[in-house]
């Protein structure tokens, strides 16, 4: 069984910032994440949505370019490319969180964490213990 000072369940903005600060204070820290580092907002909600909105905004600007004295021929959208860009933005930011975990020597445990008696967490059949467990699941 691996022993930590702090285990953080969830790697969204609350979880990963908490883990970074704990590690900076000298505590042996782990983050348990069931999906992608960064949480729902970064990977599926806020960030990719804003990337999609930006693409729509740029397309709208192109449609009205003549209002600004500019001529744009054949402005067209490619929905697959728009979605690919949105995913790329989110993936880049998730990789940024991954970099911060590594830089701050935080163990990232992939899987679904289940709280157990005695300050323990089970992740897919493997048990971890900590002096403190922080629930940051959103």
Regions found by a protein language model. Name each.
Residues 15-16:
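N-terminal Rossmann-fold NAD(P) dinucleotide-binding loop
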Residues 1-12:
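Beta1/beta-strand and adjacent pyrophosphate-binding region of the FAD-binding site
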């Amino acid at each position: 069984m691996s022993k930590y000072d702090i285990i953080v369940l969830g790697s969204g903005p609350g979880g990963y910032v908490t883990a970074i600060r704990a590690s900076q204070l000298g505590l042996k820290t782990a983050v348990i994440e069931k999906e992608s580092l960064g949480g729902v907002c970064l990977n599926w909600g806020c960030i990719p949505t804003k990337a999609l909105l930006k693409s729509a905004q740029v397309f709208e600007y192109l449609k009205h370019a003549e209002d600004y004295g500019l001529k744009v021929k054949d402005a067209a959208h490619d929905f697959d490319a728009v979605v690919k860009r949105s995913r790329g933005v989110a993936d880049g930011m998730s990789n940024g969180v991954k970099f911060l975990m590594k830089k701050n020597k935080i163990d990232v445990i992939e899987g679904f964490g289940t709280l157990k008696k005695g300050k323990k967490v089970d992740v897919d059949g493997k048990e971890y213990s900590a002096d403190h467990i922080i629930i940051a699941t959103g």
